[in-house]
Amino acid sequence: MNVLLPDTLPQALELLSQNGDAVPMAGGTDLMVHWHVRPEAHQHTFVDLSRLEALKPLSWTADMLVLGGLTTYWDVIRDERTREEFPLLVDAARQVGAIQIQARGTWAGNIVNASPAADGVPVLMAYDGIVVLESRRGREQVPLDRFYSGYKQMRRRPDELIVAIHVPRRRYSYQVFEKVGSRRAQAIAKVGLAVTRSDAGWRVVAASVAPTIRRCPTVERLLETGAAVASPSDLLPAIAQDVAPIDDIRSSAHYRTRVMARLLYHDLRDFWGK
């Protein structure tokens, strides 16, 4: 294993540019799992980002919450302003593993790990989060709902780092985060759901029911139009257009689809037309 330890962001970007197969390392919580499952992953070159102090804090502007590239789940949990304005971020952070994972794991790492069952990504997407990428060539911003192109595939080049995540500040009239797993804590989601309503409209984001975490535009349109929904089964045709669950070791496609329908029906029962 070869570990490179830059002191500044420019140094880190230079190292990524020079080492095309280098893997950025932040909290390391997901990488440790990969090392256990795939011992050959140790052979990579890693760029340890732990000295990049500028990427650690979260901050606020008049228009947005800014999560740094190294902001941890615990940073969000303990921030009172975030608890008030973006409670789903706190809800999701509290469900990411144990306290040790929450203390080390980063929001940017959760995005780049690209797990379809991630806890942090659905709520960021429901809040219209924007990924800020930087390389030696410059910066670009990518809406999180356009960041993934397929399973473990994303709009990030090997020489780019996520240096920030922008979360627009809006007035929300409704927001909920649901996670269904084998246990009440420290479980990987069988089904995840984040829903928000603001002046920008409805956002319905599903996890663990497709190759990527994704918005559900068909379900969103039902909410926007006040469609009549008398039971969870009425939602199944719309869900079928938005997601593509699979059978795996944690659950079945049939179970996931029907749990998602029940969550949507019961959580949003005040908004469905009669």
Where are these regions (language model features)?
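C-terminal structural segment of proteins
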Residues: 1-274
